[in-house]
């Protein structure tokens, strides 16, 4: 039987809550500064005689709250409680693992990991320098390519004289031979790359009968290292190597250069080239742009030049390649080719790069870099300008590395699709169909079946921003996951298109923590550790892009991460103090998860200016956990009915009827609500007390409903269960408190887009409830709980086994997550920070419950390491 989607459920499940007394969104209450506020204080004296007195503060006056006959005081000892009519019942406490992040542990870690305060002046300098890099992005910055320069230097003078047309390029070759006799990227060594560049340079010098010393040194280098190619992995071959290298070997032989032509590897690659040349579909070669245009210099004997000219790019190049364009010019004399080469040398002076322009590639990767490093908030204008530029060149078949590039690149296209969609641009996933073959597999370029890890990683990350019904994105997800898992099994899993510091680490993180199961600060920490400021790229030759791989990005990211972490540590210490002063720390039926809760919000809403949002969210979540545990561990339904009644009436005079543990819970909630209301009024410019109370009433009624189910051993229908449980998970309640403090003044219309009336909130609660139940239902069933999504689904569908029902629940959850993504990415009326808070709550639930009950069992699970890395361990 097909699992119903959330939309089919919504016809049965009311998203609005009508069973509580109605409140307008912001009902008119008196000024919140006059609201009575209770707090607990400890008298001095011995521990045996310490009394915690309840005080009512009205303005500057402090009076003892009158309860029954005289003042009520709360003692830490139950035998001193005056609860004659309602004795404290025995609670059915669950056996929770004790909290790990106690004050002594936190202090110990923080003292051993102290770092110097961030140099604010250095931070500002780095921000300014990176902004200048963004503003300076034109057609792309890249390093010289000895290989391409050698091809440009081969062009003879147009006047027929025996000289190169671009003599400065020949001089560059003569002056830039490396000490070992090779040419190429000095700080990175790949045998294929060095031998290719060296062979091109010694051929060009020989053609112009100059640089005999350099030629001889180059030949010696070639002889010494040629056999090493056999041992270097195939995926380290530059693009088109199998065509251009054998072609140059043949040319070197015709020039009588003393090279090891009889090496088995060289003979083998020449044979492979001959076989591949026969398989090139000539009809495809001349009708549509393919990657073959990138290395035409290696296909000269089969190319019909008058036909290939029809595929020339608008800028006169052939796929932005100086070498390929130079080869076409020498065979055709095409003036547009010459114009392109003049354009390149006007930019670089005496050398040519591997390809140029690279404007789209550079902008996308720079944006991706600052976003993944967690420093994008400093560059909002620059990012917007870069993405507007990308979008202006977006095509229905994707984009390549340059605006005039007629051959789309799957890596650039996938990154562009993901980043543009995440930033609110309207882009279709249909562009990915360009890169799919008849077997449903994805390739990097038209005309090439090879794939690289970086390309497939970008495609995988792109697939996670799919909208419902985008089958090509789902296919991309499955294809890339299979490819990337296989790549990880290879000990030498490197990449075809680049030399990255830790591509394995990037892939492992992406597969283990996909976008919906990650959080921004967690990803930033991971990428800071994996990012390589000196990474190189591999096209036809190796090159470096300084606006993508730059130590300034990493330095700023580290300074910023550690600075933000130090702010979060101070906030956590204050929250730990509040946890104790509220009395919650003394309750033995609840879970101490202050650090884990704070981690969940600090990993998302991490900016220093959102301190109040973090504080309110954390305290509200703590209070919710305490109350949830209270209702789960209740001694009698009557007690919690009394608690609910007190909240509805907001009546302090019900305190004398409450057992001690319920008094602590009520006072904690009462003080917190008033605290939030006071601050909320300042931020929103209107009274929010009624709004906040109404949210708590809705929340507690769902707790009450579940307690009644538990008491009666009642298993509701799946629809009835979801109606209550998607609210009791508390996501909407917590988020709706937090959004008041995101820096936005929220209208009733904005709130209606994210509160209980909205699809957004419903999906958030539904996905949170379902992932929670899948990981907790067995343990809770063992403790006597009978209602969970799995058990309720099995009640409706007795033909399903437990395992089958669980699969159905996962299917429903994934469908709801897909719908939630669409709401997040398409919502236009909701401020970004409000959307983030809603969406990242859902992501945090997926993270915490990814492998089990990562909240209750947090001290024994991977969440513990996440908390440590984000909150306590500075980046070295």
Curated annotation (Swiss-Prot):
GO molecular function, one term: magnesium ion binding
Motif (DDXXD motif): 628-632
Catalytic activity entry: (+)-copalyl diphosphate = isopimara-7,15-diene + diphosphate
EC number(s) per entry: 4.2.3.44
Stored Pfam families: Terpene_synth, Terpene_synth_C
UniProt: Mg(2+) 1 binding residues: 628, 632
Keyword entries, A-Z: Chloroplast, Lyase, Magnesium, Metal-binding, Plant defense, Plastid, Transit peptide
Pathway(s) served: Terpene metabolism; oleoresin biosynthesis
GO CC field: chloroplast
SUPFAM superfamilies assigned: Terpenoid cyclases/Protein prenyltransferases, Terpenoid synthases
Primary location recorded for the protein, binned into one broad class: plastid
Cofactor: Mg(2+)
Chain sites annotated for binding Mg(2+) 2: 628, 632
GO terms of biological process kind: defense response; diterpenoid biosynthetic process
Organelle transit peptide: 1-64
InterPro entries attached to this UniProt entry: Isoprenoid_synthase_dom_sf (IPR008949), Terpene_cyclase-like_1_C (IPR034741), Terpene_cyclase_plant_C1 (IPR044814), Terpene_synth_N (IPR001906), Terpene_synth_N_sf (IPR036965), Terpene_synthase-like (IPR050148), Terpene_synthase_metal-bd (IPR005630), Terpenoid_cyclase/PrenylTrfase (IPR008930)
Top-level lineage group: Eukaryota
Keyword Aminoacyl-tRNA synthetase belongs to the record: no
Residues that, per the record, bind Mg(2+) 3: 772, 776, 780
Cofactor, free-text remark: Binds 3 Mg(2+) ions per subunit.
Biological function: Involved in defensive oleoresin formation in conifers in response to insect attack or other injury. Involved in diterpene (C20) olefins biosynthesis. Monofunctional enzyme lacking the DXDD motif in the class II active site relevant for the cyclization of geranylgeranyl diphosphate (GGPP). Requires (+)-copalyl diphosphate ((+)-CPP) as substrate, but no activity with GGPP or ent-CPP. Isopimaradiene is the major products of the enzyme followed by sandaracopimaradiene.
Domain note: The Asp-Asp-Xaa-Xaa-Asp/Glu (DDXXD/E) motif is important for the catalytic activity in the class I active site, presumably through binding to Mg(2+).
Family per similarity comment: Belongs to the terpene synthase family. Tpsd subfamily.
Identification of the protein by name: Monofunctional isopimaradiene synthase, chloroplastic
Species of provenance: Pinus contorta
Organismal lineage: Eukaryota, Viridiplantae, Streptophyta, Embryophyta, Tracheophyta
């Amino acid at each position: 039987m097909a699992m119903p989607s959330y939309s089919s459920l919504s016809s049965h499940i009311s998203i609005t809550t009508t069973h509580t007394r109605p409140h307008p969104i912001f009902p008119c209450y008196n000024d919140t500064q006059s609201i009575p506020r209770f707090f607990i204080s400890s008298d001095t004296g011995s521990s045996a005689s310490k009394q915690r007195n309840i005080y009512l503060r009205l303005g500057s006056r402090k009076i003892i709250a009158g309860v029954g006959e005289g003042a009520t005081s709360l003692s830490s000892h139950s035998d001193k409680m005056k609860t004659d009519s309602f004795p404290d019942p025995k609670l059915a406490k669950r056996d929770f693992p004790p909290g790990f992040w106690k004050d002594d542990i936190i202090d110990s870690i923080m003292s051993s990991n102290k770092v110097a305060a961030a140099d604010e002046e250095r931070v500002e300098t780095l921000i300014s320098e990176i902004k200048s890099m963004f503003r300076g992005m034109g057609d792309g910055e890249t390093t010289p390519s000895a290989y391409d320069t050698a091809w440009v230097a081969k062009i003879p003078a147009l006047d027929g004289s025996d000289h190169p047309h671009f003599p400065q390029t020949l001089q560059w070759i003569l002056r830039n031979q490396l000490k070992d006799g090779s040419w190429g990227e000095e700080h990175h060594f790949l045998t294929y790359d060095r031998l290719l560049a060296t062979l091109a340079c010694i051929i060009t010098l020989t053609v112009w009968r100059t640089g005999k010393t350099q030629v001889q040194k180059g030949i010696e280098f070639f002889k010494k290292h040629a056999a090493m190619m056999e041992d270097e992995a195939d995926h380290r071959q530059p693009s088109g190597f199998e065509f251009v290298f054998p072609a140059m070997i043949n040319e070197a032989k015709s020039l009588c250069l003393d090279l090891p032509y009889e090496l088995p590897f060289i003979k083998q690659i020449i044979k492979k080239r001959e076989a591949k040349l026969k398989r090139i579909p000539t009809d495809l070669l001349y009708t549509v742009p393919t990657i073959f245009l990138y290395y035409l210099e290696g296909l000269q004997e089969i190319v019909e030049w008058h036909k290939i000219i029809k595929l020339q790019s608008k800028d006169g190049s052939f796929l932005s390649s100086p070498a390929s364009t130079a080869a076409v010019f020498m065979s055709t004399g095409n003036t547009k080719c010459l114009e392109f080469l003049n354009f390149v040398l006007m930019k670089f002076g005496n050398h040519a790069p591997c390809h140029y322009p690279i404007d789209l590639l550079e902008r996308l990767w720079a944006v991706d870099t600052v976003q993944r490093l967690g420093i994008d908030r400093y560059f909002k204008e620059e990012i917007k300008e870069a993405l507007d530029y990308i979008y202006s060149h977006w095509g229905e078949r994707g984009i390549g590395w340059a605006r005039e590039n007629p051959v789309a690149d799957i890596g650039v296209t996938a990154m562009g699709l993901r980043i543009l969609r995440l930033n609110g641009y309207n882009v279709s996933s249909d562009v990915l169909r360009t890169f799919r073959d008849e077997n449903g597999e994805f390739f990097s370029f038209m005309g090439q079946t090879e794939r690289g890890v970086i390309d497939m990683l970008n495609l995988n990350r792109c697939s996670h921003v799919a909208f419902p019904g985008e089958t090509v994105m789902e296919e991309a997800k499955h294809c890339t996951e299979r490819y990337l898992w296989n790549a990880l099994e290879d000990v030498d899993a490197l990449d075809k298109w680049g030399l990255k510091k830790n591509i394995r680490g990037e892939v492992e993180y992406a597969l283990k923590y996909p976008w919906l199961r990650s959080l921004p600060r967690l990803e930033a920490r991971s990428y800071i550790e994996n990012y390589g400021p000196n990474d190189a790229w591999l096209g036809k030759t190796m090159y470096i892009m300084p606006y993508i791989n730059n130590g300034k990005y990493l330095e700023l990211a580290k300074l910023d991460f550690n600075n933000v972490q130090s702010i979060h540590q101070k906030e956590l210490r204050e929250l730990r103090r509040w946890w104790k002063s509220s009395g919650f720390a003394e309750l033995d039926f609840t879970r101490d998860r202050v650090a884990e809760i704070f981690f969940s919000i600090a990993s998302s809403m991490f900016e220093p200016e959102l301190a109040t949002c973090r504080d309110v969210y954390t305290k509200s979540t703590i209070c919710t956990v305490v109350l949830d545990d209270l209702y789960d561990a209740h001694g009698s339904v009557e007690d919690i009915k009394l608690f609910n009644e007190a909240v509805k009436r907001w009546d302090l005079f019900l305190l004398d009827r409450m057992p001690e543990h319920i008094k602590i819970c009520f006072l904690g909630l009462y003080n917190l609500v008033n605290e939030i209301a006071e601050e909320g009024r300042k931020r929103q410019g209107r009274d929010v007390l009624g709004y906040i109370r109404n949210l708590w009433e809705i929340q507690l009624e769902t707790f009450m409903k579940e307690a009644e189910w538990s008491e009666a051993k009642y298993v509701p229908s799946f629809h009835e269960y979801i109606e209550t449980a998607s609210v009791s998970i508390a996501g909407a309640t917590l988020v709706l408190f937090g959004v008041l403090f995101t820096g936005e003044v929220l209208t009733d219309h904005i709130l209606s887009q994210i509160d209980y009336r909205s699809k957004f909130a419903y999906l958030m609660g539904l996905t949170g409830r379902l992932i929670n139940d899948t990981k907790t239902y067995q343990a809770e069933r063992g403790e006597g709980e009978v209602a969970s999504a799995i058990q309720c689904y099995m009640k409706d569908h007795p033909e399903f086994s437990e395992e089958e029902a669980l699969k159905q629940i996962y299917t429903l959850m994934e469908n709801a997550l897909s719908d939630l993504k669409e709401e997040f990415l398409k919502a236009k009326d909701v401020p970004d920070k409000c959307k983030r808070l809603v969406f990242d709550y859902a992501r945090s639930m997926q993270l915490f419950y990814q492998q089990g009950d990562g909240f209750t069992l947090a001290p024994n699970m991977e969440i513990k390491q996440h908390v440590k890395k984000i909150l306590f361990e500075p980046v070295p």
